[in-house]
Amino acid sequence: MNKFWETGRKIVAVGRNYAQHAKELGNEIPSEPFFFLKPTSSYLLQGTGPIEIPLESSDIHHEVELGIVIGKKGRDIDLKSAMDYVSGYTLALDMTSRDQQSIAKAKSLPWTVSKGYDTFCPISGFIPKDKIKDLNNVELWCSVDGQIKQKGNTNQMIFDVPHLIQYISSIMTLESGDLILTGTPSGVGPVKPGQVIKCGITGLDTDMQFDIILRKRN
């Protein structure tokens, strides 16, 4: 699973899983997990290139997240065995075209466009399962041009990882190499071409850094 981005078939992104993030965007705190899908073509591995800002969007936001890499196929997974299906983790960004998302929300349309552009799921690479000892105490941070914008802990999540796995697998089969993005803490905000975004997990050597550029059409 150390190259899950090459083998996984889907990215399941959980929304509004940190109460303060839900509030900062004016959303209600969910009573059950809420998720959407991102295409695997949106993966951008650390060191392989910049994040591209699409020409048709002027409000791109960073959202740092802990990613859960699924290690084996499962359906209707129960809470007690949920972690048996986890092979490891990744640090990820769920890049979001906020203006495109607002248009979709106003029209009651899916968020696919706002979340699915190429390079909109930057990742650090694979983090072995044993590197994170306490999944309920993982501090994530994100900076833009050296200024910290996001800092939050997984102990602030509304739904923990076993509950997310249980819920998602009750709807769709989770397969080896799939990635679950577990939500973002508060502090999301815009990035622009020419800026540099950096993210990390406190205490782990997982820092990742990406330049931001304006996309050039082929």
Curated annotation (Swiss-Prot):
Cofactor(s) listed in the protein's UniProt record: Mg(2+); Mn(2+)
Q: Which GO terms describe its cellular component?
A: cytosol; mitochondrion
Main localization category? mitochondrion
Its subcellular locations are: Mitochondrion; Cytoplasm, Cytosol
Recorded GO molecular functions are: acetylpyruvate hydrolase activity; acylpyruvate hydrolase activity; fumarylpyruvate hydrolase activity; metal ion binding; oxaloacetate decarboxylase activity
Q: Name one Pfam family in it.
A: FAA_hydrolase
Q: Which domain of life is it from?
A: Eukaryota
Query: Can you state which reaction this protein catalyses?
Result: a 3-acylpyruvate + H2O = a carboxylate + pyruvate + H(+); acetylpyruvate + H2O = acetate + pyruvate + H(+); 3-fumarylpyruvate + H2O = fumarate + pyruvate + H(+); oxaloacetate + H(+) = pyruvate + CO2
Transit peptide span, please give it.
1-18
Q: Where does Mg(2+) bind?
A: 63, 65, 94
Q: Which InterPro entries match?
A: Fumarylacetoacetase-like_C, Fumarylacetoacetase_C_sf
**Keywords for this protein:** Cytoplasm, Hydrolase, Lyase, Magnesium, Manganese, Metal-binding, Mitochondrion, Transit peptide
Q: What is its EC number?
A: 4.1.1.112, 3.7.1.5
What's the subunit arrangement here? Homodimer.
In UniProt terms, what function does this protein have? Mitochondrial protein that acts as an oxaloacetate decarboxylase (ODx), catalyzing the decarboxylation of oxaloacetate (OAA) to pyruvate and CO(2), and as such is likely a regulatory enzyme in the TCA cycle. Also displays acylpyruvase activity, being able to hydrolyze acetylpyruvate and fumarylpyruvate in vitro.
Q: Which family does it belong to?
A: Belongs to the FAH family.
User: PANTHER family in the record, alphabetically?
Assistant: ACYLPYRUVASE, ACYLPYRUVASE FAHD1, MITOCHONDRIAL
Task: Provide the protein name.
Answer: Oxaloacetate decarboxylase, mitochondrial
Read off the lineage from the record. Eukaryota, Amoebozoa, Evosea, Eumycetozoa, Dictyostelia
Gene it is expressed from: fahd1
